């Protein structure tokens, strides 16, 4: 009997510190905002940082220890996570990688900066060293109990959860 090794699974976390003065300057420049004026969807409170990245990272390390690498994707920012990982998960420090938008937008630099999470998530496949199977987190998503690879993948395919809903007119059939 052939011994098949389970595929490696990585985690990718999208993160931004919306209170970073340099980020705010870039946003104002590209969104052509006047100081203290917001566009719908670009309100300051939407990007406030409450250390979500640290909760997210610790939850992954604690409840999904089988994940091989964790990539934190950001735009010229430092999430300052290494001291926390060193303190609580010292053997995992080398598994945490900060990835700048410049890396994933290589060849598409003219589209930077971008503040659009859809654009960013569409470029994650360009992360160097990323496994074919990975779990994508926003920094405000946390794992709250132990998981295993089959929580996310079965037969090398992603597990989808939720309910299929019929359009209202089909419910009467």
Regions inferred by a protein language model and the residue ranges of each:
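Short loop/turn segments at strand-loop or loop-helix junctions that form parts
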Residues: 10-19, 24-25, 101
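Short catalytic/ligand-binding loop motif for oxyanion handling, primarily in non-cytosolic enzymes
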Residues: 19-23, 78-83, 106-107, 142-146, ...
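Short beta-strand/loop segment that forms part of the nucleotide-sugar
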Residues: 68-77
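A solvent-exposed, charged loop/short amphipathic helix patch at secondary-structure junctions
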Residues: 18-46, 162
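Active-site-proximal specificity loops/subdomain of glycosyltransferases
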Residues: 38-44, 48, 80-130
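Short beta-strand-to-loop acidic/aromatic patch adjacent to the donor-nucleotide binding site
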Residues: 131-144
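Short, acidic, metal-binding catalytic loop of nucleotide-sugar glycosyltransferases
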Residues: 59-67
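Conserved donor-nucleotide/metal-binding helix-loop-beta segment in metal-dependent transferases, i.e.
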Residues: 144-173
